[in-house]
Amino acid sequence: MNGPVDGLCDHSLSEEGAFMFTSESVGEGHPDKICDQISDAVLDAHLKQDPNAKVACETVCKTGMVLLCGEITSVAMVDYQRVVRDTIKHIGYDDSAKGFDFKTCNVLVALEQQSPDIAQCVHLDRNEEDVGAGDQGLMFGYATDETEECMPLTIVLAHKLNTRIADLRRSGVLPWLRPDSKTQVTVQYMQDNGAVIPVRIHTIVISVQHNEDITLEAMQEALKEQVIKAVVPAKYLDEDTVYHLQPSGRFVIGGPQGDAGVTGRKIIVDTYGGWGAHGGGAFSGKDYTKVDRSAAYAARWVAKSLVKAGLCRRVLVQVSYAIGVAEPLSISIFTYGTSNKTERELLEVVNKNFDLRPGVIVRDLDLKKPIYQKTACYGHFGRSEFPWEVPKKLVF
């Protein structure tokens, strides 16, 4: 039986097949997310001028400082100072009173050319569709029929809470808000022959950075009335739902002043909130030849297409690659028993409908466009504006 960590019995979970699952999200001003957004802003700046740019840009931030480091081969002329400062300004760190200021922070640049050893085996003297994977690795795509987006409800709601918080901050409705925030949602589920059905929300956790002028009680009321009730469907909330709103009691010091930030440290927030699986590779700051990103997007496209076609209710797709090799080494399909077809039959459907070479993925998903800064907060999946979220009509 699933239950609280203290071992107290939760009778709502006594029914066979009941369990709880938790996912978290972070806001734009979280230090790791600042770095993700800067890395993707740099990628976009190159792609706007050079769609064939090879970019691997990492970012580090701490109080009053941003470091760009990595490898970039591009004909674009990019003003890194401006890109970094514009990104921080958009996020909302525009005053030293908030702990970080785009106008005064120091921007250090340590960017080099892509290794010629990598270039010669991946893309030099190759047709685009024969471009090799930029590295070895394994990537996963996941989809579930529990929401319209084919995403887990836990991560969908965690992202929506953060999005709502940012909207209330930018509109001035809650002027005491600052850019850093974290949310966490625990949902009680029932299993249904391998599929999962959300029943109710067990717990919601929200922590938001704030100014000195607001009381804890006022913050808690605003978060419940103007954030949670505006985002979470009432059918999932009941008198037993637990709320931890500003559980630390005080969160004035946030962003890079509170913690150092690094690109690629929120890979579970970026994907499925702990559902499915993760191969370990981060997304932000990487062009399409980095299969950590492009193949993970393609695997999600495959997974969502299978669910939307009614071939399964829940699915995990794994792909793997070797550096310099265009064809994936393996493709694996796991349906948790939710399909009338065998996994071998589903693999035949995938092979008939999808070409998972990086040079074909980039064409099918239009990955040379400068769309990446938008992906860098509130999740890369479940958002209809991105091509990998448009299910392919399958022939089978």
From Swiss-Prot:
Pathway: Amino-acid biosynthesis; S-adenosyl-L-methionine biosynthesis; S-adenosyl-L-methionine from L-methionine: step 1/1. S-nitrosylation of Cys-121 inactivates the enzyme. InterPro entries: ADOMET_SYNTHASE_CS, S-AdoMet_synt_C, S-AdoMet_synt_central, S-AdoMet_synt_N, S-AdoMet_synthetase, S-AdoMet_synthetase_sfam. Its EC number is 2.5.1.6. K(+) binds at E58. Residues 114-126 are annotated as: Flexible loop. It catalyses: L-methionine + ATP + H2O = S-adenosyl-L-methionine + phosphate + diphosphate. GO terms for cellular component: methionine adenosyltransferase complex. Its cofactor is Mg(2+); K(+). GO terms for biological process: methionine catabolic process; one-carbon metabolic process; protein homotetramerization; S-adenosylmethionine biosynthetic process. The modification S-nitrosocysteine is found at C121. It is an enzyme of class 2 (transferase). Pfam families: S-AdoMet_synt_C, S-AdoMet_synt_M, S-AdoMet_synt_N. It comes from the Eukaryota. Belongs to the AdoMet synthase family. Homotetramer (MAT-I); dimer of dimers. Homodimer (MAT-III). Catalyzes the formation of S-adenosylmethionine from methionine and ATP. The reaction comprises two steps that are both catalyzed by the same enzyme: formation of S-adenosylmethionine (AdoMet) and triphosphate, and subsequent hydrolysis of the triphosphate. This is S-adenosylmethionine synthase isoform type-1. It comes from Mus musculus (Mouse). The lineage of its organism: Eukaryota, Metazoa, Chordata, Craniata, Vertebrata. The gene is Mat1a.
